[in-house]
Every structure is written in structure tokens, then in C-alpha cells.
Amino acid sequence: MTVTVVYDNSEATELCAAQHLYLKPIAKLMINVLLPECIEPVRPFSNWEVLDQLKSLICPDQFTTVRLSKSTKDFIRFEGEAETRSLVQILKAKLHGKIIKLNGLKTDLKVVATDAQGEWEHFPKEKEASVIEGAEEQDHDKGPDSIYFEGLPCKWFAPKGSSGEKPCEEILRVVFESFGKIKNVDIPMLDPYREVMTGGSFGGLNFGLQTFEAFIQYQESTDFIKAMESLRGMKLMLKGDDGKALACNIKVMFDTTKHFSEGAIQRRNQERLKLQELEEERKKEKKREEEVAERKRKDEVRKAQEKRKKARDRRRALKERDRHRQRKEKVKTKPEARQELDSSGEWEERKYLLARRRVEALRLLRVLLKKIAVWMRKEKNLKPCQTHISLLLNCLGSTQCNPQEVGVMKSEAHHTPGTALKSPEEEELNTRHLLDWEEMPSYQASTLDLSQKAEKRCYQASKSDNKQKQKGKKKTKAQLQKSSHTPGVKQMRHSARKEETGKVLSDGCDYSLVSDQNSLQSTMIADQSLAKEDHASSNESHSSRQAVINRGRKQKIYETDEFIDYLLNYYQTPEYARFCLEASHLTSTCQWQRDVYAKGDGFQIYLRKQGYHSNSLSEEESLQGIEQDEEQDWPQVYIKDPESKSQKTGKINYAKEFTKKLKNHCKDIASETDEHLSPTDGESYPVEKIHSHGVKDSQHIRKSPVSSSLRSVDVGLPLADFLEEISSDSECFSETLSMNQEEEERSMAVYNSSPEKRPLGTDKISTCKQKTKSSQQTLCSEWKHDNEGKYSKHRVRAPGKRSKSELRYSWLEEEGDSIRVDKNISKTRGKLAPKHMLDEGQYHESSSSDELESTTRKKRRLTSGMFDQNVKYRPLHMPSMPPKRARAFYLGYFSRKRQTPWKSEYNQDVRRFKRYENSEDYTLDSDNYYVSHDDNQEHIEYGSYLGDSYSSSLYFKMF
């Protein structure tokens, strides 16, 4: 209902003083405007024009509210409300019977004003008439005794101080008991089930004020009638504490639905029960849902707790396991530490024993070499070889050398090339003198003392190895890098280089014997560790340079005690075959392979044709800006030991014929030489060659090239086998020496040539194609490393630069004392083209440049690999000589660098024969012999392993 502000409350009557509720009469006026009855069309007009005319009639008075109640073709009805009833009467007088004129209308409009009546004003008259007609016997319960209120403001009937706006039945009862005693009061808004049953239509909003419905039943009908009469045409007014009053129209009617009847009450109760049951079910369902949700929540919490607990247990178990493992490791480390302490003493004793065995092996080797020298001294045709045996003994047994002889040799080493060498008779006398001196008792005593000193030095060196290993490794790398970038000694002219032939660029003593053109230039390096006490005076001048060279040196694998232990305790003489021949053509891809086997007194030869493809790496030469690559494919010769029996026996005749031809050819070579290098006996071998890489002292000893003895007819294979057994050229090298990754660079054998004479062309050094037979590698310079798979590439170093570690060796001999083979002098000398045999049948070839024949002296560095070390060497350049007097015999040492994987199955006892394209040229190649024949020159290379601490490689070149 409409809530209005009351300005004049003079006509208000009190309803309930406690709630400040009053009843104010409704002052309404009904205004009817009659429309004219005419057929003629009139101008249309609006209701607002008529209302404006009415307001002008009552001016200055005003209506509180005016609204259009009804509009027809006959009249227009307006309902107006004023403040008081007296004012309504005044307005009625002003409006009743008045005429309104509208513009455009020919006729006038008449106004009729009357008082407004309630909707149920006729109700008491009907009831009174019925009573009069004799309806007194009718039950009053059947009559309307309940009042229905609509539009009561909730806030006005709510308890004071409450935040809610819900009405209270007690307040409603108190307010309306002023008319009589109330029997029942019902507010449907307060019943939640009723709100569900009726759809929530028990209240509403009246201009922002929430209202409600109520049913009131009086006990007495008279009270009911009194209340109805009092509430007819009234408004409910609330007077505030501040004096302001608000009036609200309420709707008051008698109850026509019999709301308080028993049937209605019973229906409402049943519905309430149903609603209660539904509500209970809803509550239970809600409770169940809550319980399920709670259970799920608890389960999740429990799972999370279990998960956290498992994680904690797992972490605890891991920590416990780690602690247990640490305790175990601690328990293990303690016995290991004690065991290491216990075994350290035993290892020191073992090192001392190994050092002593090494010295004893050297003694035994010297004794054997002396016996060979004595035998060769008896042979008349082996006088030239006696000199080399003596030199070998001097190098090997430098600790026993006569200081006078050492001084003599050192003085001879600095002679000019014009100085002639001693005659063969003088050399023989020197050799005998040396042998006689070695057989003296004083020599034995000094040998014993020196051996004991050497043992102590080896023992002390082995103890300091482990401490200096890490320092030495870093220092060696720095020194190698420094030495690799440091320019070498500049190339001197022939006259100046003659004066420098006696200089020492490596460890040990340097003995140089220089003669004229047909001279022998030799350099011998003695073992420094065994000779430095007895030769302190002779080596004093070279100590400073040796200290510089030895600085940063890394210990080699064959110097270690582990290698010596393997060599002395586990190494056994190889039992595999030793003879195998193979021939190949230089240009053809298909080759005839010839295998020669020793069988009894003869040979057995197999011939078979095979396809071959070589993979080679050529040397790079840089001489005067010209680069030339040459490749030579030499036949491969394998010689097997008589121990390996042949499976085929059908070609013995051819083997015997080949053997006879070889013997005759060796005899021809011996007959052409002046000094009969090889024995006249055909069964003997011309030269013995073993590439040696001996074990050095662990502190500062370097390997020294030394000469070896010739093999005689009487000594034969057993002596060579025995030497191989005690030598260091064994399978141990292939298995242990590959562990050494870094060694100082060395360049050896630099020979000068005179500018005014034409330099000799370097000879062809033949290398063999390797044929794997029963998984055996048969080339002496061929090794396999476990980790590397590339082949080394040899480069010629630019002239004028030389590494500090280069060694010069120039042995020059008189024409009468040299070995000479004059064949077809008119032909051009061959160029040096060494082919280094690679593993698995692959070649490593090198080529030389034609600029070697120019007047400028060229230096050449051939980098190759041995035991995976960086070692530099130079080709041999002999002084130029006339062809007729071209008899030169020189000793050189080639250190070959290998980067290819070396195989451990190194065949030490293989004998190899090589045949060149020329049918008259043969090469007897083995681990003990290496002979290369050419039209103008021949090569004889021989060497021998001379113990654990010595190494040598002798190379003879005949022109």
C-alpha cells in the first residue's frame, strides 16, 4: 500500500499507544466529469486537460493524491484524497455542479463530486436483514468472524531493537485486541511451510516497505463487527519519536475462505507435516552429504598424511642407507689403508729386485757381445765388423771404458773432415786393447761397484717416480710446447758444420770420428746413469746442456718397473712362424704373393695371386717451395721360423732354387765389397738388424743409439733367439709402451753436404707390405696403440730450423775401410722415399724432392711415431763425392713415430726377404737383417737390443 507523510493528524484516533499506531480516516472525493451526448464529431482531448481544469477550480486548495479511476464514453472518473474530511467537504462544494470548457469543444463538460464509500459497507445491513428474517438459529460459526488484513508494514509490527523485519504475532495480537478478545492469529509469512505451499505470495513491497498478511479471529462476533466498523475507511498511521507521522493504506476485509475452520486448519497441519518430513529428509540428505564430504575430506587428509609419512620413511631409509654405506666405506678404507702400508715395503723390495735384474741382464749382454767380438776377431774376413762390435761394447759398457780411450775418441770426434781414420790394423789393436782391459780384475771390481751404484740409482729413481709424476707431466707438456716453437740452430756452411760435429745435443757422451770425403762419421751415446761417475770429468763440459735437455722429461713406459716386471717374469719367447715371402708389383693392383717357409734344410714357397689396394699417406716436403709426393710399393717378404710347420709340401724344389739364388747373390755382394761385409758362407746373413727401443732410467736416462754385432755362421739362429729373449724388443712393447703418450721430440742423423760438390741423392729405403699371418704383425717398426686409429703424417721441416733435441751423427770412414758396391755408376742416384709399414696392410709412404740435388744444403725432418710419442728425425745426407770414390759407411738412427693402433701380437722372430722389381736386387729383411739393393747403392741396416737400458739402430748405406 501507499505510504504518505501526514502533515495534519488532528483527526487521528489511537489504536495502540505502545506501538505508536493510530487510525486516520481516509478523506476521498469521487469526481465524475460527464461527456456530452452528440453525434457530431468533436476534437479529441486528453484526460490531463480535464484534470488541469479541475485543479484550477479548487485552487488554492490541493489534493494530496489524484488518480484516474475510470474512463468511458459517457464520463471520466477521478479519485482524489485530501488531508482531512473537512477539506474534502470544501473541495466537494467547489467542484460539484461546475462546468468545464475545453478549447475546440462546442459543448461544456459538467462536474459531479460525491463522497467515496467502502467496499463492504453493505455487509452489516445484509446481516441485520437476515437476522430480522429469523435467521437467528444459524450458527455464528458459519458467518464471517475473521478479519483479513493485507498491506500491514512488517517493520511496524516487528519487535523493537531487532535487526530483522519479520512481524511478531504477539505484537499483532496486542494491537488489535483493543476491539475485543482475539481467538486466533495467523501470519502466513511466519510459517515456512505455508510459504512453500502458497509459493511465497504472503508479502510484498510497497514503495520500499515490506508488508505482510494476517488473519485475526475474534471470540465474539460483536467484537468482530466492532472492529470492522472501526477499521472501515481508515488508514494506519505511525507517529515517530520525532513527531513525524507516516500513513499507510491497509486493506481490511472479512475472511471469506474460512481460514480458521477445522478443515482448513487440518489441511494446513497435514501440509505442514509433509513439509516437515520433506524438510527432515532434506536435512538428512544434507547431513549425509556433509558426512560423505567430511569422510572424503578425512580420507584425503589421511592419504596426505600417509603419503607424507611414506615420504618421511623413504627419506629416513635413504639417509640410513647412506649412513650405512658411509660406515661400510669407512670400514673398508681402513683395511685398505693398512694393506697399502703393509704392501709398500714389499713393493720397494720388488723394485730393488727388478733394478738388480736389469743390471744383471746388462752384464750378461756385455759378456755375450764380448764373446761375439772374440769370435769375429778370429775371423779374417770380418775385420770391418770388429770395429763396430768394439764401438758397441764401448757404448754398452761405457762404465768400464778406459778414460784414456774416451779422451782419444772425443779428440777424434772434433777432427776436421780432412783427417783420416785409423787403419783396420789400428782398429783391431784398439779392440784387442779394450777387450784385454775389460778382462782385468780391476775391471771386474769397478764393474761390481758400478753395478751396485746403478742398482741403488734405479731403486731411488723408482721411489721418486710416483712423487714427480704429476709435476713431470705438466712440466713436460710445457717444455715440449716450448721446444716445438723454438727455432733450432741455423744451418751452417760445410766448413762450419765440420767444426760442430762433436757437439752433444742429447744425453750421454758423444764420440765423433771424422775423416775426409770417404770417411765414417759415427756418434755413440752411452748410458748416462751407469757412466756419469766414472766419466764425470769427460762429461762435465756437457752437463749444463744435458740438464736443459732433461728438464721436463717424462718417463717412458719401458722405463717403468711394471714393464720390467712383465719382461722378467711373464714374457715368453714367441712360438709363431718366422719365414714368409711375398712379392708385389709396383703398378698392378693384383699381386703375386709368395710365402716362403723353412722346412728342414730348405724352403717351401707358396705363390698366390691377390688383389691389393694400398692406403698410404705421403710425406710432405717443403724444399724451395716445391712439394713432391712419391709412392713406392715394395714387395713384402716374410720368413717364418723352422718351428712353424707348413701345411703344403708340393713346392720344395722352388724354395731350394730360390735359396740357392739368394745365397749366390749374397756372395756376389760380399765379393764386390772391399772389406767383405758379409761372410762368404752362403748360409750366413749379411747384416743383422733389430730396431731397439730400450728401457731407460726412470729419472734422466735417454735412449742411446748403439751398434750391434754381425751374425756369424757358427752362431746361427739360436744365438739370435737368445738375444731376443733377453732383449727389450718383445711383445711387452706392444702391450705396455703404448701407454706413454708424451715424449720429448728428437731429431737424429743430420748429415751435411759440401756446397762446392754435388750432394748425393738419398737412397731408397724399402719398407715391406705387411701380411697378417695367424694374427701376427711382422714389421719391426710397427706397433699398435690401444686408443689411436690415425696414421702419422711425415712433414719435411723448413730449412734453418731445428729442435733442441736433435742429435747429429756423422761417421765417416776411409775409402779403403768403407763398404762399397759399385753398380751402374752412370745411372742417377735414387731419392730417399721411405715407406713406413702400417697395420692391416696399409702403407705410410714418403717422398723426397728433386731440390736435394741443388747446391743449397737442405734440412729435412721426418716426423713419425713410435710408441705414440712426438719424435723428430731427419734424413741422412752424405757429403757429395765422386762416383768412383763414393764409398761411404755411416750409422744413423731413425726414430719412427706411430699414431696407428699398435697390435700386441708383435712378431719378433720373423725373417723377411724382399725382392725389388729388378730381379737381381734382393733385400734380406728380418728383425735381425735389413739389406736394400739398388742400381747405384745398397742399404744395410742392422741393430740389436742391447739390454733394458740401452737401445740402438745401426743403418749402413753403401754407394
Curated annotation (Swiss-Prot):
Residues 538-547 have a biased composition (Polar residues). Ubiquitously expressed. It is found in: Nucleus speckle. Residues 261-334 form a coiled coil. The modification Phosphoserine is found at residues 671, 678. GO terms for cellular component: nuclear speck; spliceosomal complex. This is A-kinase anchor protein 17B. The lineage of its organism: Eukaryota, Metazoa, Chordata, Craniata, Vertebrata.
